[in-house]
Every structure is written in structure tokens, then in C-alpha cells.
């Protein structure tokens, strides 16, 4: 469900691609395609060996890579948007590994103090909307 929703969000907010590591589920799985309302067939995607390798490749191409986490150091609305940005999402539950959070600028979506997290696809939609430029 999350993979399909992430592709749907990527299409809605004009993401150029979705890049995954080997731990991500198949976006061409029937349920992911259905949840994405076909966006998984339209938004280009690629796979890297690991999240670290994906980040290395993006940084080599001069992307601003932002790690989205409830524990992010900066509110997403305070981020200076770069011409080329990539948003790194973690798995539902464990989130992003500490090694990546300490390496990258981390951003959070501010929420009420008595609530600490959102579904990964919902968080992706909010963050993509914030970073999207028409």
C-alpha cells in the first residue's frame, strides 16, 4: 500500500523519479499498481544496492539529499529548496538508519507534541508538496 501511495504522490507533485534500494518492495506488484492508480507505470524508477549507494550516486550528481524523519533537525518548511532535491524515506516503523540521519541534513514535519509520527506515504505527500515547484 505504501509503495503505491508513494508513487501516486510522486506523480501528483511532479517528482522526476522514485529511486529505491534493494529492501523496497516491487512497485510493479499488482496491489502497488492499483493503489498508485497507475502512477507506478508512469513515474520512472530505479533501484540501487543500498540506501548509502543511492545517496552516494545522488550526491555525485549534485542533488540536495534530505532525510525525512520525525526526529529531523530542521522543520521542512524552513529548508532552502535546491534546484535538484531528493527526499530519502525510511521504512515504516524503524525509519532511516542512524548512519544516514547523521550524514545528511534531516528534516521533520512539525506535528502536535502529543503525536510523533505519520504513515510514510502521508509524510512523503506532505514533504513532496512542500518541495514541489510548479
Set out the residue ranges of the language-model regions.
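RNA substrate-binding interface of SAM-dependent RNA methyltransferases
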Residues: 1-71
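Active-site/ligand-binding-proximal alpha/beta "capping" segment
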Residues: 66-115
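Glycine-rich nucleotide phosphate-binding loop and flanking beta-alpha elements
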Residues: 1, 26, 72-74, 94-96, ...
Amino acid at each position: 500500500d505504501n509503495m503505491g501511495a508513494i508513487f501516486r504522490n510522486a506523480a501528483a507533485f511532479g517528482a522526476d523519479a522514485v529511486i529505491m534500494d534493494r529492501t523496497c518492495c516491487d512497485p510493479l506488484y499488482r496491489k502497488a499498481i492499483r493503489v498508485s492508480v497507475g502512477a507506478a507505470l508512469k513515474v520512472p524508477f530505479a533501484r540501487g544496492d543500498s540506501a548509502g549507494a543511492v545517496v552516494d550516486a545522488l550526491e555525485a550528481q549534485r542533488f540536495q539529499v534530505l532525510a525525512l524523519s520525525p526526529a529531523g533537525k530542521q522543520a521542512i518548511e524552513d529548508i532552502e529548496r535546491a534546484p535538484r532535491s531528493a527526499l530519502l524515506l525510511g521504512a515504516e516503523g524503524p525509519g532511516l538508519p542512524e548512519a544516514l540521519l547523521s550524514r545528511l541534513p534531516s528534516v521533520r514535519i512539525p506535528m502536535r507534541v502529543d503525536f510523533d509520527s505519520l504513515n510514510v506515504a502521508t509524510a512523503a505527500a506532505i514533504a513532496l508538496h512542500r518541495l514541489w515547484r510548479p
